[in-house]
Regions:
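N-terminal active-site segment of His-dependent metallophosphoesterases
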Residues: 1-54, 59-68, 130-133, 139
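Beta-strand-turn-beta hairpins that frame and shape the catalytic cleft
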Residues: 1-4, 88-98, 218-223
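Active-site neighborhood of phospho(di)ester-bond hydrolases with catalytic His/Asp-centered motifs
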Residues: 5-7, 26-31, 52-57, 82-86, ...
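Active-site environment of divalent metal-dependent phosphoester hydrolases
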Residues: 10-16, 33-37, 58-68, 88-91, ...
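Glycine-rich phosphate-binding loop signature in dinucleotide/nucleotide-binding domains
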Residues: 20-21, 91, 158-162, 202
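A basic- and aromatic-enriched beta-loop-alpha substructure that forms the phosphate/nucleotide-
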Residues: 53-59, 64-125
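Binuclear metal-dependent phosphoesterase catalytic core
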Residues: 79, 178, 184-204, 211-247
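Active-site-proximal loop/helix segment associated with metal-binding centers of metalloenzymes
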Residues: 97-165, 171-181
Length: 247
């Protein structure tokens, strides 16, 4: 099966025309567009192929979690778009596991400091609300969602499958962090150290976004791929508009 892989298209800043390839499935690994825009874009440019869609953090900007989950999941019903949040999709002999993931805020081994830093510098915790009370979305909320997603992923990966692709928005390893940000104190809000987790379960491919620089490397037998377009000022970052990977 051939996968056409994208993340961080950010169509709220600049439109993206989907190129035709020989892919069997399109993967959108988060931050396609804020609110409902990413889903609406995916419907408008559909190339007759099934699309797998997960939320990033930006989908929730000026929206509420989990209300937007319910809204966008409903928008995908009856379309070629499969919305995943702690959900599994089987296509042929390939099992696809998808979730936003968020992070464990433990990349540097100091969760309280990471919570404080993320709360101060990340727009996630300024622009996202929680429904139904519409209180502020906090780093501890993201951490709780992460723990639930990891628990679900682990239970899913324990079940054998011919081929497995994991899709998350947040990065599963510090190896995905661009060199210029290697020591940034906000990194715990971008990546978790799931290297041992990946080594234990060895899915075939782990696709992520959130970083606005491409990544393509292996952890054991698992290929880690990030193909982000990023913001307009980042165009030229190495993004491949027609990236197709076979699993």
């Amino acid at each position: 099966m051939k996968l056409q892989i994208y993340s961080d298209l950010h169509i709220e800043f600049a439109w993206f025309d989907l190129p035709k390839t020989d892919a069997d499935l399109i993967i959108l690994a988060g931050d396609t567009g804020v609110g409902k825009r990413g889903i609406e874009w995916a419907k408008s440019v559909e190339a007759g192929l099934p699309v797998v869609y997960i939320h990033g953090n930006h989908e929730y900007y000026r929206e509420a979690w989990p209300k937007l989950l319910e809204t966008n999941r409903a928008l995908c019903e009856g379309s070629n778009i499969r919305f995943l949040e702690n959900d599994e999709l089987i296509v042929g002999d390939v099992r696809i596991l998808g979730c936003t993931l968020w992070t464990d805020l433990n990349l540097y081994g100091n969760i309280p400091f990471a919570e404080l830093t993320a709360g101060q510098y990340m727009n996630d915790f300024k622009l996202i609300r929680k429904s139904p009370e519409y209180s502020k979305f906090r780093p501890v909320d993201a951490l709780q969602i992460h723990r639930k997603s990891i628990h679900w992923l682990e239970n899913s990966l324990k079940i054998p499958a011919a081929k497995t692709v994991v899709i998350t928005h947040h990065a599963p390893s510090s190896k995905s962090i661009p060199d210029q940000y290697k020591n940034d104190p906000v990194n715990p809000a971008f990546a978790s150290n799931l290297d041992n987790f990946i080594m234990q379960y060895q899915p075939d491919i782990w696709i992520h976004g959130h970083m606005h620089r491409p990544a393509d490397y292996f952890i054991g037998k698992t290929r880690i791929i990030c193909n982000p377009r990023g913001y307009p000022e980042q165009f030229g970052n190495g993004f491949d508009p027609a990236l197709v990977v076979e699993v």
